[in-house]
Amino acid sequence: VSVVALGRGAQQQVMNQTSELGTNTLDTFPGKDFGDTRAAAIETLVAADAQALAEQPYVDSATPNVSVSVTALYRENAAMAQVTGVGFEHFRVKGLRLASGRFFDQRDVDLHAQVAVIDQKAATALFPGNPSPLGEVVMLGEMPVEIVGVLRPAQNSFGGSTPTFFVPYTAAATRLVGKYHLDSTTLRIKDEVPAEIALKAATSLLTERHGTKDFFVWNSDQIRQAITRTSTTLTLLVSAIAMIALLVGGIGVMNIMLVSVTERTRE
């Protein structure tokens, strides 16, 4: 019973961590699939697509995404960092929470504001011993940004180890990336809407906007389903092992009792 309980507890822990990844989301990428060599040449996925998706009745929130790797520099501390340009709704889409400071808002996006929300890895790498980096200015490549928020530490182990800066996508596009088309969009589906229905509707909308299907949509709920199947299988395996161990232990006890009875009968 204890072994089975441990297995189920581990399964629940994995599912709780998975839920923090924002599994009720749809990601749209240019190209036919991951690894499409022609995806880099497709420039039709734009911020207006994310806005159009955000206005749909099945969507809770949506964000455009552009990313680039740069050297982050603060005084004598430097680190390779991932700069992700996003909309102000990104933090709602992903279910991220603050440890301190604030998220940037629509006004920051409209003004191409050079502000950033950082994760704990960035805070540790660039501000060792500084419990409050708010208001500090970091150089991201050639762009200075002011730190306005620090995210809470992630409770899951699925993230990478690279320090991450979230900045308004408008600032990233004009001052870092030098392009106006997107790497991807991400939308959060309303809780009461089935993911498959939302996927079909989003695909139809973007196909109509682009005039062709030059993108693919990734349903991140597939991750949750795969992890659920795997953890269920592991729980069943642990239960089977526990039953076998119990059976073997019972046979051992029976043998000992039989030997004891035989000896007493002989006496």
Question: Residue locations for each model-derived region?
Answer:
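Conserved ABC ATPase nucleotide-binding domain "signature" region
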Residues: 113, 222, 248, 262-266
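Hydrophobic, regular-secondary-structure patches
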Residues: 7-82, 89-92, 107, 124-125, ...
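Intracellular coupling helices
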Residues: 242, 251-267
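Helix-terminus/capping and membrane-interface signal
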Residues: 1-23, 233-237, 241-249
